[in-house]
UniProtKB/Swiss-Prot annotation:
Pathways involved: Porphyrin-containing compound metabolism; protoporphyrin-IX biosynthesis; protoporphyrinogen-IX from coproporphyrinogen-III (O2 route): step 1/1
Assigned GO CC terms: cytoplasm
Keywords: Cytoplasm, Heme biosynthesis, Metal-binding, Oxidoreductase, Porphyrin biosynthesis
Organism: Vibrio atlanticus (strain LGP32) (Vibrio splendidus (strain Mel32))
The organism's place on the tree of life at top rank: Bacteria
Active site: H112
Protein name: Oxygen-dependent coproporphyrinogen-III oxidase
């Protein structure tokens, strides 16, 4: 197995955060990210620090957050050891970049991406490590061209790593970003992977890099195509209603959110994925044959793109 290089992973993640922020600022044309660099106090349950960057009230993006964090703890939280009992009693480090973009225009999909590295160590034993991550798209008024180009970018970046990688990680994404209480997928998916170490460090790291860099390549062309689409109050209301699903998923099911909160992570950074505005409506039903109804009938279930 190739040597584990934690510093190389960290430097890649820092440069990825810089690159994505620059590209999003360019796409917005008005707003800039504000950085909040933070460091854990000695003696806290979780050590380490990070850079939280948030953009608000842009011309294109209502709110966007791009987080880097590198934290360490003396014991893994329950959310991690539940499916990996061998991690109990090990000290750990977790580092990653996580981002969520909430555009103003309802015709631009919300998007999310995350790439991360975990290592859990115990004296006298081999380290347990893995990579995880992915990206997914949540349209409110989906356009097939956008969904297809998003998945094509995902397919292309997976190709060098194996013939089955796209299909496996696409299906994993469909299963992961699913709300059982609504019987809906969160959006049209993308890629999701976790616990990746069977390829060895070098190839696993290379794949994580490809996914991290693939996000902007997949998302920004969609932003450009849709940012001038006219919309009114009806579309805005529906966007805010559907953002409620984003909140439901993140607070009830998302493993990263649960891990962060259970391990004593930085709450403000963890919850920066929340939309600035969302709404709920009792027993909402879209009008028959409307564009809103089309989202439910055709897009909130796994599809071949």
């Amino acid at each position: 197995m190739s040597a584990i290089d934690k510093e190389a992973v960290k430097q890649f993640l820092l440069s990825l955060q810089d690159s994505i922020c620059q590209q999003l600022e360019q796409a917005d044309g008005t707003a800039l990210f504000e950085e909040d660099a933070w460091q854990r106090e000695p003696g806290e349950r979780l050590g380490g620090g990070g850079r939280t960057r948030v953009m608000t009230n842009g011309a294109v993006f209502e709110q966007g957050g791009v987080n880097f964090s590198h934290v360490a703890g003396k014991a893994m939280p329950a959310s991690a050891t539940a499916h990996r009992p061998e991690l109990a009693g090990r000290k750990f480090e977790a580092m990653g970049v996580s981002l969520v973009i909430h555009p103003k225009n309802p015709y631009i999909p919300t998007s999310h991406a995350n790439v991360r590295f975990f290592i859990a160590e115990k004296e006298g034993e081999d380290p347990i490590w893995w990579f995880g991550g992915g990206f997914d798209l949540t349209p409110f008024y989906p356009v097939d061209e956008d969904c297809q180009s998003w998945h094509q970018t995902a397919k292309d970046l997976c190709a060098p790593f194996g013939d089955d990688v796209y299909q496996e990680h696409k299906e994993w994404c469909d299963k992961y970003f699913y709300l059982p209480h609504r019987d809906e997928t969160r959006g049209v998916g993308g890629l999701f992977f976790d616990d990746l170490n069977e390829w060895g460090f070098e190839k696993s790291f290379a794949y994580m890099q490809a996914v991290g860099e693939g996000f902007a390549a997949a998302y920004l062309p969609i932003v450009e195509r849709r940012k001038e689409t006219p919309y009114g109050e009806r579309e805005r209301d529906f966007q805010l209603y559907r953002r409620g699903r984003y909140v439901e998923f993140n607070l009830v099911y998302d493993r990263g959110t649960l891990f962060g909160l259970q391990s004593g992570g930085r709450t403000e950074s963890i919850l920066m994925s929340m939309p600035p505005l969302a709404r709920w409506e009792y027993r909402y039903e879209p009008q028959a044959c409307s564009p809103e109804a089309l989202l439910y009938s055709d897009y909130l279930k796994p599809r071949v793109w």
